[in-house]
């Protein structure tokens, strides 16, 4: 069972969001976070973001070592319907997690957000809302989608709660 929230098309340009192109994959940033195209170079830092409670309710097993994380990253990057990002805190300049667009269907003008995880250090901070704002703005203003959905497994109570907090 999935929780799905649909947002209407709105322009969010007054938030001063900067979009920079890098190999046809965007780097998105605001005052709190920078979203960089996910790469195997992020593997070691991302492993440090994983813990058992964080991954509870996810549909895939946790990538608990660098080799498994690199496999996870390669899998995310190999799917043309996904656009995965490493999340970098602009406060600490450290990688604090990952988030993704997926199931992008340009012909239907729809996209989903998910496959998100963050270091426990940033739970409840401005990181998640900042990431979602950047992704929503990019989806509506650059990808020109009409429908955006957040999807999480119903067993993933932490993610469902974080989505509800977005409003």
Indicate where each model-derived feature is located.
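Conserved GNAT acetyl-CoA-binding A-motif
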Residues: 141-151
